[in-house]
A protein has these predicted regions:
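Conserved catalytic-core motifs of eukaryotic protein kinase domains, centered on the activation segment
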Residues: 73-78
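A C-terminal cap/extension of S-adenosyl-L-methionine-dependent methyltransferases
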Residues: 130-186
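A short glycine-rich, Lys/Arg-flanked "PGG" loop and its adjoining helix->strand segment in the class I
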Residues: 80-109
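Residues lining the SAM
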Residues: 65-68, 84, 113
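A conserved beta-strand element that flanks and buttresses the S-adenosyl-L-methionine
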Residues: 63, 72
C-alpha cells in the first residue's frame, strides 16, 4: 500500500507509470481537486494529515512531497475555502510527521521533501531550516533516516549539502512580482 500524502501523484501520466501499476494507492489531500482517477483504482481521502483515518502500521510507502510546509498554515489561499484552515501554527507539520510514523509499517519508507534554507513563514507555506529538519527526524525516530539536499542554480537543481543550502531563499510565485537572482520559486 502506498499513501500519497498531499496529492503529488494525482496526474494521469504519473499514475500510468509502470512502477505504480498494480499498487494499492491512496491519495490523501485536504480538499477535492479538479481531477480524480477512480477508474484507475485510486482511493481518495479528503482529510487533514495531522489526523488521518488509517489504522496503525497500514502503509508500506508514504510519499509527501511539497506538502508538510503548508500544514498548520493558511491553506485558504490555494487549497480550500474552509476558513477553519486559515491557520498560523508553524509547528503543525510535526503532528503530520507523528501521524506518518504511526501509519507507516515497521521497515516502511517515507519520502518527504520540504523547501530548505533560511526559515521564513510566507503565510501559506514556510521554508524549513536545520532545526526544523532535526525536529522531523526526532519526531520520526527511532528509524533509519537518509537526507539529501538540493539547491537551485541557474542551470537547474543540483545536489548540495545541508551547510551549503542553509542560506537558500525562495521566491513566492503567488505573492511576489520579482524573481530572485536564482529563479528558485516555491
Amino acid at each position: 500500500r502506498i499513501l500519497d500524502a498531499g496529492s503529488i501523484l494525482n496526474y494521469s501520466f504519473l499514475l500510468d507509470h509502470h512502477k505504480l501499476q498494480n499498487k494499492n494507492l491512496f491519495i490523501s489531500t485536504l480538499a477535492p481537486e479538479q481531477d480524480a482517477f477512480w477508474n484507475k483504482g485510486i482511493s481518495y481521502i479528503y482529510e487533514d494529515l495531522r489526523n488521518t483515518c488509517f489504522r496503525n502500521d497500514y502503509f508500506d510507502w508514504i510519499t509527501s512531497l511539497s506538502t508538510v510546509e503548508h500544514i498548520g498554515l493558511d491553506n485558504t489561499m490555494l487549497y480550500t475555502s474552509d476558513e477553519a484552515k486559515r491557520e498560523s501554527d508553524g509547528e503543525g507539520y510535526l503532528a503530520a510527521i507523528k501521524e506518518f510514523h504511526r501509519i507507516l509499517k515497521p521497515g516502511g519508507k517515507l519520502f518527504l521533501s520540504v523547501p530548505f534554507g533560511e526559515h521564513k513563514v510566507r503565510g501559506w507555506f514556510q521554508i524549513f531550516n536545520g532545526e526544523m529538519v532535526d525536529s522531523i527526524k526526532t519526531t520520526f525516530s527511532p528509524t533509519e533516516i537518509k537526507e539529501n539536499y538540493f539547491q537551485y542554480q541557474g542551470s537547474g537543481w543540483v545536489n548540495s549539502s545541508r551547510e551549503l543550502a542553509s542560506n537558500a531563499t525562495y521566491f513566492d510565485i503567488h505573492t511576489e512580482k520579482d524573481y530572485g537572482n536564482d529563479y528558485a520559486a516555491a
